[in-house]
Amino acid sequence: MSRPLLFSALAGALALLSACATTQPSADQIADACDLLTDNHDWYKALRHSSKEWGAPMGLQLAIVNQESSFDGHARPARGPRKFFGLVQGDRPSTAYGYAQALETTWEQYKKSTGNRGADRHSFRDSVDFIGWYVNNTGLQAGVGQYDYKAHYLAYHEGAGGYVQGTWRRKTWLVQRANHVAGQAARYESQIKHCKALRPKFLGIF
């Protein structure tokens, strides 16, 4: 391959990698769902699709992603202390990964249940569809109302069985976190509702 063609190929590859990369949103964007979803319109479409499919409010989905991963599609739980005189990395406390911090076993259940066999935990679209599916299931099993954001997050963390049994009652830190998620979900829902940039355009023109 000649040098000009090689440089051209390299430039094309770099451009493709750049286009595929997802930049983690800034703190200002995370604070405002309107700005966040206007700048990431594919995320808005994914949230809307999941909401229509499963009934999970978009604000709740977004608040769970923020709490679980801070919008980092490759997030994992922090490792424990290093072992063997610091020569070996510590273990992670769970298999949680991706935007939704879904566990491997629960993710496999989601793929089998929905038929979405190619779903990836680092995909925002797949992650919010997972959240919608999970919220719908735990809502039905635990009798949680659609807009009871606090209860939904507690069930997301503890599972439907744990929520019904009240395992969360002994975890003050979790109740505080659920209150925070509920407040953010309500703010996100309001911001999305009043965001002019996200409203359908007439004939795609106005």
Question: What is the meaning of each model-derived region?
Answer:
Residues 22-206:
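Catalytic glycan-binding domains that act on GlcNAc-containing polysaccharides
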Residues 16-19:
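C-terminal motif of bacterial Sec signal peptides marking the signal peptidase cleavage site
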Residues 1-9:
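Bacterial N-terminal signal peptides that target proteins for export
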